[in-house]
Amino acid sequence: MNNKNNLLFIPLGGCSEIGMNMYVYGYDDGKNIDYILVDAGVTFPNPEYNPGVDLIMPDTSFVEDNLSKFKAIFITHAHEDHIGSLTHLFEYIEAPIYCGKFTSFIAKSKIDKGGGNSDLVKIAPHYPKIIKAGSFKVGFVNI
């Protein structure tokens, strides 16, 4: 992008559908671009229309092509439509993963199952404490 200070939103899944939540946020200051990933979900196919298919995952090629620019991953909660693809994503991602305490147990289990580094999972501090991830400042609010 040529303009300074652009906020980008790239839904990889979860928009106009139920499940498969995965959202990329980007910030371009004109020199560098930083990304964060919010959620990493899957959806479950209808066996009537997709026999033999266990899970459907968003296309993560954008993430794979921009790995070094991803500063963090934030998981909102431990439902499969928000966390289910961690098993597969962590074949290649090395960014820290922030989530709540309960969600951290599920995330570590999924990453271990996929052969990734579960030490990347961090329990997010509650707001007003802020997590700095590249150009982003993120606060976790319990609902």
Which residue stretches match the model-derived regions?
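Catalytic core of the metallo-beta-lactamase
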Residues: 5-12, 17-29, 129-143
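Pre-active-site segment of Zn-dependent metallo-hydrolases
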Residues: 17-20, 27-75, 87-88, 92, ...
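Short, structured coil segments at secondary-structure junctions
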Residues: 92-93, 134
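Metallo-beta-lactamase
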Residues: 103-143
